[in-house]
């Protein structure tokens, strides 16, 4: 049985529908940049995964939508620049990553709940403790901190209400 979505169906009928999408690059960062700019990676300067940052002069889809009254948000892996100038986050954040500071809020997004990189498909605050002899990881195994954090649109590290019955995050 199909799920009935009359509001989405009406919106799609009155809109431009894209039925095909081609990635701009074989890796994530340049493709993400192309999705939010509509431009080829060599035009905005991010050529490889987890390198570079969105330049301030680059116009994004979020900025265009804001001009037309939309509220914009980014949720999940950003991978288009660092999210903090102070804390060491993932593999590029912190004082060493200042030159690549380019969070979603500097690129037209009103709200965000984002990580600099590496959003796993399990608890995003944990990573498995593994050794080279193992070929899998069970979610019940021991974990350690993942090394990346969630950040909000004000540049604050999100630490509360991320998991369990008291979670206050709804997407």
Q: Could you say what each language-model-derived stretch is?
A:
Residues 1-171:
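Formylglycine-dependent sulfatase
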């Amino acid at each position: 049985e199909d799920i009935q979505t009359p509001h989405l169906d009406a919106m799609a009928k009155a809109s431009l529908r894209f039925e095909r999408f081609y990635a701009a690059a074989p890796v994530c960062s340049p493709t993400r940049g192309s999705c939010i700019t509509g431009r080829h990676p060599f035009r905005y300067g991010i050529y490889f995964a987890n390198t570079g940052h969105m330049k301030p002069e680059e116009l994004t889809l979020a900025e265009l939508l804001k001009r037309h009254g939309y509220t914009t948000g980014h949720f999940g892996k950003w991978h288009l620049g660092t999210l903090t100038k102070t804390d060491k986050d993932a593999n590029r954040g912190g004082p060493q990553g200042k030159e690549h500071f380019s969070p979603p809020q500097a690129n037209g997004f009103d709200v965000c709940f984002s990580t600099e990189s590496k959003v796993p498909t399990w608890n995003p605050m944990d990573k498995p403790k593994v050794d080279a002899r193992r070929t899998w990881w069970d979610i019940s195994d021991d974990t350690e901190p993942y090394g990346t954090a969630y950040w909000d649109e004000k540049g604050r590290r999100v630490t509360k209400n991320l998991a369990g019955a008291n979670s206050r995050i709804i997407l």
